[in-house]
Amino acid sequence: MTLDRDAASHVAEVLSEALPYIRRFVGKTLVIKYGGNAMESEELKTGFARDIVLMKAVGINPVVVHGGGPQIGDLLKRLSIESHFIDGMRVTDSATMDVVEMVLGGQVNKDIVNLINRHGGSAIGLTGKDAELIRARKLTVSRQTPEMTTPEIIDIGHVGEVVSVNTDLLNMLVKGDFIPVIAPIGVGANGESYNINADLVAGKVAEALKAEKLMLLTNIAGLMDKQGQVLTGLTTEQVNELIADGTIYGGMLPKIRCALDAVQGGVNSSHIIDGRVPNAVLLEIFTDSGVGTLITNRKPR
């Protein structure tokens, strides 16, 4: 076999750059929210599974939380169930909740588990109902206009927020060399099911586990300034300033607040990374430059 010296040299450089990061993160827990384009491209799905397996192989403990909004929308359409959204949240009546559980807890979760296992990992699929992994309550949504004397309370059905996370279960699985893959479905005090935003679940899981990192895969290059340049490293104080001056707005706000809350809740750093980039997770962890925006209380990169 002919040795391509340039290729071999490049591999050596990559490994050399990665080694200090591998040493730093051995034994640490990283929570990765998996969604967006990274779940739709076969090449990116395979790359993600391989990245997760590699992380586990070098002694890092990945915990995956996944979304699945497009897949839910597809099945609802096929079943002739109309979708409604309020402030970006899917109104979830009983029929819609049944579909959410089928898609997230069944199809999507098991596809991810199967893909990781096919590439040499030991993934195990969970929803928040397993061993009451994610205790939840109904999310209250209100609106108020200048003409209103009191806020209007809007019922969006089985949409929830996280009350608590069963860390004993997750720690047991991690210590057993399993890779937890979590569907963002919570369970209420009376056993009722709740549809919860996957970013929020990932953030709360990261906080509860005191994870080293929270990584949110997105369909953008990272958090950008007003000139469209990616901001690679920010402190929590700088993020709050960008929210206040309107640089961060609209649909990006909930994701950024989730990342911010995680850091303020004890996670060492949050990362908004471009899930469209092959091997984005590894590039963000193991290279000097990364592929997104890092948010931390420490001096940014």
Curated annotation (Swiss-Prot):
Any one Gene Ontology BP term: L-arginine biosynthetic process
Gene Ontology terms, MF aspect: acetylglutamate kinase activity; ATP binding
Annotated positions for site Transition state stabilizer: K33, K255
GO annotation, cellular component aspect: cytoplasm
Protein transport found in the keyword field: no
Gene3D superfamilies on file: Acetylglutamate kinase-like
Cell compartments where the protein resides: Cytoplasm
Keywords: Amino-acid biosynthesis, Arginine biosynthesis, ATP-binding, Cytoplasm, Kinase, Nucleotide-binding, Transferase
Zinc found in the keyword field: no
Reaction equation(s) it catalyzes: N-acetyl-L-glutamate + ATP = N-acetyl-L-glutamyl 5-phosphate + ADP
InterPro entries (UniProt xref): AceGlu_kinase-like_sf, AcgluKinase_fam, ArgB, Asp/Glu/Uridylate_kinase, Glu/AcGlu_kinase, NAGK-C
Residues that bind substrate: G68, G69, R90, N195
The EC number(s) this enzyme carries: 2.7.2.8
Family statement: Belongs to the acetylglutamate kinase family. ArgB subfamily.
Job of this protein: Catalyzes the ATP-dependent phosphorylation of N-acetyl-L-glutamate.
HAMAP family: ArgB
Descriptive protein name: Acetylglutamate kinase
Organism name: Pseudomonas putida (strain GB-1)
